[in-house]
Amino acid sequence: MSQYQLIDKRVPIALNNPSITHDLDKCKNCTLCRRACADVMSVLDYYDLDANGDVPVCIHCGQCAAACPFDSMHARSELDKVKAALADPEKIVVIQTAPAVRVAIGEGFGYEPGTFLEGKMVGALRALGADYVVDTNFGADLTIMEEASELVDRLNKGGQIPQFTSCCPAWVRFAEIYFPELLPNLSSTRSCIAMEAAMIKTYFAEKKGIDPHNIVAISVNPCTAKKAETKREEENAAARFHNDASIGMDTDISITTREFIRWIQEENLDFNAIEDSQFDDLIGMETGASIIFGNTGGVMEAAMRTAYKLVTGNEPPPHALTHLEEVRGMNGVKEATVQLGDDVTLSVAVVHGGKNARDFLNALKENGKHYDFIE
C-alpha cells in the first residue's frame, strides 16, 4: 500500500524532494496542484507510483506550489542556510539575482506588478548582509555564447539536430525521465545560474583575492527547479577546475523570490525606504540579449542574434532578428524561420509547459518535421 494518500486529489511529494514540500495540515484537497502537475506539466498520471517503487516522479518545476492557494504546497525553504552563512565571519557571501526577480519583488511590498526595482533589490541584499551582489545576466550571456557556438558547430560538422536548449533544469529532468533518447540533442550548456556560480568560485575569486573555500554562492531566482539543480553531482565545475572537491558545489544555496520577500519581512526591513544600490563590477555587466532570458522565447531570440554574428561576422540588422515576433508571446508552441545571412536558413521552435512539450515531441517522432533549434 502506498504511503501517499488521496493522490486523486493532490500531488505526492517525497520527503526528500529538494525543491518542494507539502504541509498536509493546510491541504484542502482542492485538486489544483494535481491538475497543474497532470494537465499542465504532464508528469502526474504519466507514471505508475506502484511500479516506481512508491517513489513520486517530480521535475521540480514548482507548478504545483504556484497553483496552491493555501500555501500547503510550497518551495522548500533554505533561508536558514542563508542566515547561517551570513552569521559566519569566515564566509564571503556572494549573491546573484536572476532578471525576473527585479520586476517581481515589488508585489510583496505594494508595488504594481512588473515594477522595475533593481536598485532597491540590490540595496536590500546589501542591507541583509551580502558581501557582493552580482547579476545573473552575466551568466545568461555566457549561456548565449556557448549555446549559439554549439549550434553553429553542430550545423557545420553534422552534429545531432535539432539542438534543444538545456538551461532549464525542469526541462532537462523531464527529458531524462520521459525522452532519454533525446539527451544527445540537448545542448551541453549549463543554466546561466550554474555557469555564473562557477565563475564566482573561479574567475571572481581570483580577481578579488578570495579563497574559494570561503565563498558561499547564493542564487535568488523565481525557479524551484534551481534548488534541485544545485544538488546534481555534475554541478561542481569550480571544484573540478581547482582539483579540490572540498570547494563543494558551484551554487551553495538557491532561494526563490518569495523566500527573498519573506527574508526582508523577517528582518523588519522597510523595503520602500531602502536606497538604491548597484551590482558589483567584474561580472556585473551584461548585454541586452541576456535581459530577455526571462521571457518565453527569450533564449531562442538571444541565441539567434549571436548565431547570426558567428555565421556572418556581422551584427544582425534591425529588421532581421531584433524583432523575432514569431517566437514571442504565450502560445504553447511557436515556430519561425530564421535567416542567418544569405546562405543559412534555420527552422526553430519555442515550446513551453510540460504537456505542450510532450505533445510536440511525440508529434515530432511521428511526422519527422525538421527543426534546427528548439527552446
Functional labels for PLM-detected ranges:
Residues D48-H60, F116-M121, R173:
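Short low-complexity stretches enriched in small and charged residues
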Residues A75-E375:
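Iron-sulfur-associated redox domains of electron-transfer enzymes in respiratory
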Residues Y46-D54, E181-S187:
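Short helix/strand-bridging catalytic loops that position acidic/His residues to coordinate divalent metals
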Residues Y4-L6, R10, S19-H22, K26-N52, ...:
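Iron-sulfur cluster-binding cysteine motifs and their immediate structural context
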